Amino acid sequence: MATTYATGKRKTAIAKVWVKPGSGKISVNGVDLNTWLGGHEAIKLKVVQPLLVTKQETSMDIKATTLGGGYSAQAEALRHGISRALAAMDADFRALLKPKGLLTRDSRTVERKKYGRRKARRSPQFSKR
């Protein structure tokens, strides 16, 4: 099997992901996943979730680059990218990932600020008199 490329997105974060058969090494922005996360186990579980669902955690090598957003958004973009790459590799993986919602792009983004208001929805204090 050759290397499969996919992109994942979340908020303003973008992850470019290359997945190939291997020994289970995950490299993000040139460093190991654990180093990149700095010991955040909850976020690590989020990133490797597609591999756990498809039972491929020790048989796929992943190389990824992320940009934009924060750590959490980048991790979710990475999860989305890994899911899409696995689905492109094998149709059986798609059948496992789809019901878990891992192939769905989370479209929630920051609401824009409107004029005449302080923030997106917060308006100036109203005084009757």
Curated annotation (Swiss-Prot):
GO biological process, one term: translation
Keywords, sorted A to Z: Ribonucleoprotein, Ribosomal protein
Keyword Cell cycle in annotation: no
GO molecular function term, any single one: structural constituent of ribosome
Gene Ontology CC annotation, any one: cytosolic small ribosomal subunit
Highest taxon of source: Bacteria
InterPro entries: Ribosomal_Su5_D2-typ_SF, Ribosomal_uS9, Ribosomal_uS9_bac/plastid, Ribosomal_uS9_CS, Ribsml_uS5_D2-typ_fold_subgr
Pfam family, one: Ribosomal_S9
Composition bias, Basic residues: 114-129
Region ranges (Disordered): 107-129
NCBIfam families (UniProt xref): PRK00132.1
Protein family according to the UniProt entry: Belongs to the universal ribosomal protein uS9 family.
Designated name of the protein: Small ribosomal subunit protein uS9
Organism: Campylobacter jejuni subsp. jejuni serotype O:2 (strain ATCC 700819 / NCTC 11168)
Gene from which this protein is expressed: rpsI
